[in-house]
Amino acid sequence: MRARPLTLLTALAAVTLVVVAGCEARVEAEAYSAADRISSRPQARPQPQPVELLLRAITPPRAPAASPNVGFGELPTRVRQATDEAAAMGATLSVAVLDRATGQLVSNGNTQIIATASVAKLFIADDLLLAEAEGKVTLSPEDHHALDVMLQSSDDGAAERFWSQDGGNAVVTQVARRYGLRSTAPPSDGRWWNTISSAPDLIRYYDMLLDGSGGLPLDRAAVIIADLAQSTPTGIDGYPQRFGIPDGLYAEPVAVKQGWMCCIGSSWMHLSTGVIGPERRYIMVIESLQPADDATARATITQAVRTMFPNGRI
């Protein structure tokens, strides 16, 4: 999205930003145990429709009995190292990685409220595609193309149009309710890029998007993931979009939504989110806030991912 000052400072100021320089990385497998997944989501689930069965055949479902990834055993140490290195550069990191097959969650413990910038376009797309699935709106081929460009190349114009048409702040409120996102809230000034969330909420959003438990039908969720898998090297405004996950996990197939924003005080904010691996096994969210120029800030968040995954893969 275009570089613009954050106008939601009043809302963010109400939440203490936790500086996590040198904080201890944590393994939070219990946070995503099978019991928690079941208890925190609607109990009644509709029977799979043929298109859902087809999608499940294409994308293998989560395998709860899967063996832990050996590399995950070293990840807490590398997350701590990445956090410390970023802190030495003046950057504050919030990072979380989920193994969907085992439920293991590794984070640096920073659950601060963050500005989402263009990552809010996920919520706009989710709400719009659900309305289409429920027959509340009819999307033309031009609308679908605009949605694709919004997700792939971060088109602000399309986001602005869909946001206004679909009810503005109600978009975020409805998505947060369906997915149980406790830290996610609409912007106080009505500007979609000032939507706030947290790394745990964004991890949860992707996880539930992928298994359909957030309410969006799997065929519509597949539209979002397909667009994220085709994320362009630069945004429609020319801003580089390969920072963080794409350039850090260069040996993995990734589907990402990026966000960036300048002038949060004297800092640049970069947010890299998405699903990773040929079977969409992993979800990662990493956000960096750094008082530096945009190129330096992009390099910092990318280096953090490379420190965590030195071989370019999970």
UniProtKB/Swiss-Prot annotation:
Q: How does it sit in the membrane?
A: Lipid-anchor
Q: List the disulfide bonds.
A: none
SUPFAM superfamilies registered for this protein in UniProt:
beta-lactamase/transpeptidase-like (SSF56601)
Q: Name one GO biological process term.
A: beta-lactam antibiotic catabolic process
InterPro entries in alphabetical order = Beta-lactam/transpept-like, Beta-lactam_class-A
Instruction: Please verify whether the record's keywords include Transmembrane.
Output: no
The secretion signal range is 1-22
Covalent lipid attachment of type N-palmitoyl cysteine occurs at C23
Q: Which GO terms describe its molecular function?
A: beta-lactamase activity
Subcellular location(s): the record lists: Cell membrane
Q: Which UniProt keywords apply?
A: Cell membrane, Lipoprotein, Membrane, Palmitate, Signal
Gene Ontology cellular component list: extracellular region; plasma membrane
Key word Membrane present: yes
Lipid attachment site numbers (S-diacylglycerol cysteine): C23
Q: Which PANTHER family match?
A: BETA-LACTAMASE (PTHR35333), BETA-LACTAMASE-TYPE TRANSPEPTIDASE FOLD CONTAINING PROTEIN (PTHR35333:SF3)
User: Which protein, by its recorded name, is this?
Assistant: Putative lipoprotein LppW
Q: What is the lineage of its organism?
A: Bacteria, Bacillati, Actinomycetota, Actinomycetes, Mycobacteriales
Encoding gene, per UniProt annotation: lppW
